[in-house]
Amino acid sequence: MTAVKEVPRVSGGEEEHGHLEEFRTDPIGLMKRVREECGDVGWFQLADKQVILLSGAEANEFFFRSSDSELNQAEAYPFMTPIFGEGVVFDADPERRAEMLHNTALRGEHMKGHATTIEAEVRKMIEGWGESGEIDLLEFFAELTIYTSTACLIGLKFRNQLDSRFANYYHLLERGTDPLCYVDPYLPIESFRIRDEARAGLVELVQDVMHGRIANPPKDKSDRDMLDVLVSIKDEDGNPRFTANEITGMFISLMFAGHHTSSGTSSWTLIELLRHPEFYAKVQQELDDLYADGQEVSFHALRQIPSLDNALKETLRLHPPLIILMRVAQDEFEVAGYPIHKGQMVAASPAISNRIPEDFPNPDDFDPDRYEKPRQEDLINRWTWIPFGAGKHRCVGAAFAQMQIKAIFSVLLREYEFEMAQPPESYQNDHSKMVVQLARPAKVRYRRRVRD
């Protein structure tokens, strides 16, 4: 360690829990200030923890290249244990976690079947829409992406046994990610109480489905989904290996990142297209041309829509699903001449890095053409274009989330015209929880398209 400089501290945070209250109300404002005052490496106080925020290519590269044994993820997210349950993914050791997350449903050959499944789910959701009406984006996309995620990642059989209660409980669970978890994830506050009740509700729903599966085991292999497999596993004494509580935890962990990514990004993609009618028209025309011959939504077709692809990338840059990624240092390190000590929290912020003006000119503008040759700003800035992280820590579900969103819009934009039902600037994110969600109201109007 040759570092001699001390990591600079950002201004503010004189209260008992340091910058916690500001982090709960305006996290992006706080992190912006860290970069403005301290540069690529600076720290803020989160309850009793110092969080060293890294930004810019060099510091981010260190963050994303580090292994779990160097910068540990599980320790950095105390809110995950009450949501997932003990021993599931975030509590598991890195090898077990890699094995659990390398779910077959996310492999290439399975992705091909998912496109058709997602198209069917979208059509099911909109079959009662009629000629025109209004939807709340958060409500619609949160429910739709619960069904698409469960159908693709767990199985259609399980999906077909769900109703809107599953989506409602799941939404409440995501709201239980208040940064107060850095003081104590079991504090007696309302959002944590609701979180625990919602999780118990999910366990009950899964338990009911499990009872049915035990009473009526699958006839053959083609009738089995992931739940059947988990229910059939026995321990050495011949008893069921997993409880409903554990299986619910596995399902939550499987869907957690993918669901809120797909739900929030779908909402923001539509909002940004509505704010920029010329791009909306371009994307719609591209879809009309692609599907003009009546082909179904397929994995193959979804690889041929560059305008929608670019609009989606730009939406992800401006509205990343996670605004901060955290780890805990397991050793002593040096980054850009600054020391990082064992036990300190280290963070990277997609919300900050994605808008560095030197890398992304006019960073606040929605400009999908940034991804066209020769600019290709996502490829040139591989350590600062980080809506899904980067390097070995790139989100495991990134390809699935992007494919899912493209499949959703392949149906919606061909069947309906959309328009804003409130002022363009009134659509905002709610940053009061670690899982960012759209602030309500977030309504749009739709009317069925008239075909020539």
Curated annotation (Swiss-Prot):
Cofactor(s) listed: heme b
Main localization, broad class: cytoplasm
GO molecular function, one term: sterol 14-demethylase activity
BP-aspect Gene Ontology terms: sterol biosynthetic process
Pfam family of the protein (one): p450
Segments for region (Disordered): 1-20
Top EC class of this enzyme: oxidoreductase
Catalytic activity: a 14alpha-methyl steroid + 6 reduced [2Fe-2S]-[ferredoxin] + 3 O2 + 5 H(+) = a Delta(14) steroid + formate + 6 oxidized [2Fe-2S]-[ferredoxin] + 4 H2O
EC number: 1.14.15.36
Subcellular location: Cytoplasm
This protein's record includes keyword DNA-binding: no
Cited InterPro entries: CYP450_sterol_14alpha_dmase, Cyt_P450, Cyt_P450_CS, Cyt_P450_E_grp-IV, Cyt_P450_sf
Keywords on record: Cytoplasm, Heme, Iron, Lipid biosynthesis, Lipid metabolism, Metal-binding, Monooxygenase, Oxidoreductase, Steroid biosynthesis, Steroid metabolism, Sterol biosynthesis, Sterol metabolism
Binding site for heme b: 73, 77, 327, 393, 395
GO cellular component, one term: cytoplasm
Family to which this protein belongs: Belongs to the cytochrome P450 family.
Subunit: Monomer.
Chain's role: Sterol 14alpha-demethylase whose physiological substrate is not known. Accepts electrons from the iron-sulfur ferredoxin Fdx encoded by an adjacent gene. In vitro, catalyzes C14-demethylation of lanosterol, 24,25-dihydrolanosterol and obtusifoliol, to produce the 8,14-dienes stereoselectively.
Protein name (database record): Sterol 14alpha-demethylase
